[in-house]
C-alpha cells in the first residue's frame, strides 16, 4: 500500500499511487520470503492479510521508505523480518470435592499427549501418553497449564495425586486443540 501519494518522477505525469492505494500482493515462498520489485521511489506499508495454519495474524503494518537516497544508489532495497506468534491453548482445571463442591488445593494433575506429536518432517517429538506438564492446584482449586502445545493435537488431563485426605480419581479429560483461526491468539 502507498503510505503517501507516490508522484511521477517528472512532476507532470499522473501519480503512480494515491495514499492507501493497494500497490500489489506478495506471498511468501516455501522459505518464508516474499519479494516485490520495480516500485517507484516513495513511502509504502505492508500489511499481512493472511497467515499460515496454526499462527496468529499480525495486523501491525510495516512501513517501508524507498525514497531517493543519492546518485550512487541505483536500487533501493528493504528487508523486514516478520515473525508470527503460534496460536496458544489455555487449559484450566478446577478440583472440587465431589459431594460439597468445595474447592481443593494440593491436587497434582498432569497434561499428556493422546497421540504421538510429530514435527513438520514427520519425526516423533513426543510419544503418545507422554507427560507434557505437571501442576498443583492452588488455594482456589485451580491449575492453568502453560505448555506451548502444537495446534490440531489431541491431549488429556488426569489427576496424578489427590490432595491430602482424598482418593485419586481415575477420570481422564480429553480434548483436541483445534486451530481457531488467524484472529484468535488463545483458545481455552
Residue ranges and their predicted role:
Residues 1-188:
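Solvent-exposed loop/turn and edge beta-strand elements of beta-rich ligand-binding domains
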Amino acid at each position: 500500500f502507498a503510505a503517501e501519494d507516490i508522484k511521477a518522477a517528472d512532476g507532470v505525469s499522473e501519480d503512480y499511487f494515491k495514499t492507501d492505494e493497494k500497490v500489489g500482493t506478495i506471498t511468501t515462498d516455501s522459505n518464508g520470503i516474499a519479494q516485490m520489485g520495480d516500485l517507484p521511489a516513495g513511502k509504502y506499508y505492508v500489511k499481512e492479510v493472511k497467515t499460515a495454519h496454526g499462527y496468529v495474524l499480525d495486523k501491525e503494518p510495516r512501513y517501508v521508505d524507498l525514497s531517493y537516497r543519492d546518485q550512487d544508489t541505483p536500487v533501493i532495497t528493504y528487508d523486514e523480518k516478520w515473525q508470527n506468534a503460534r496460536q496458544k491453548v489455555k487449559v484450566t482445571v478446577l478440583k472440587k470435592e465431589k459431594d460439597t463442591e468445595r474447592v481443593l488445593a494440593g491436587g497434582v494433575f498432569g497434561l499428556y499427549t493422546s497421540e504421538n506429536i510429530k514435527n513438520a518432517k514427520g519425526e516423533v517429538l513426543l510419544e503418545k501418553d507422554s507427560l507434557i506438564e505437571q501442576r498443583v492446584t492452588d488455594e482456589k482449586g485451580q491449575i492453568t497449564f502453560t505448555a506451548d502445545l502444537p495446534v490440531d493435537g489431541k491431549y488429556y488431563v488426569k489427576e496424578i495425586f489427590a490432595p491430602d485426605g482424598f482418593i485419586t480419581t481415575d477420570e481422564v479429560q480429553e480434548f483436541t486443540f483445534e486451530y481457531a483461526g488467524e484472529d484468535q491468539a488463545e483458545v481455552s
